[in-house]
């Protein structure tokens, strides 16, 4: 959660265009569902932790969205996979 706030309000996390784009995306996600932007960001961070234990992923290109229609809400994640990690079973 602190990482989210640092990225939203710091000037070194990326250029202004990318920061504005991320803020707008979070606002749109919130408007389209009853889930707060903070919950969506926490979900994104949890997904990164879990998936990273199995695969190498491009965290900067990862996208998580909530899409809804009249009947349901869908979690849509675009997670670029760079490679698989070997695990000892």
Curated annotation (Swiss-Prot):
SUPFAM superfamilies attached to this UniProt entry: Cell division protein MinE topological specificity domain
Superkingdom assignment: Bacteria
One Pfam family it belongs to: MinE
Keyword flag Cell cycle: yes
Keyword flag Cell cycle: yes
GO BP terms: cell division; regulation of division septum assembly
Record key words, sorted: Cell cycle, Cell division
Membrane spanning stretches: none
InterPro entries: MinE, MinE_sf
Record-annotated disulphide pairs: none
Function: Prevents the cell division inhibition by proteins MinC and MinD at internal division sites while permitting inhibition at polar sites. This ensures cell division at the proper site by restricting the formation of a division septum at the midpoint of the long axis of the cell.
Similarity section: Belongs to the MinE family.
Protein name in the entry: Cell division topological specificity factor
Species of provenance: Heliobacterium modesticaldum (strain ATCC 51547 / Ice1)
Phylogenetic classification of the source organism: Bacteria, Bacillati, Bacillota, Clostridia, Eubacteriales
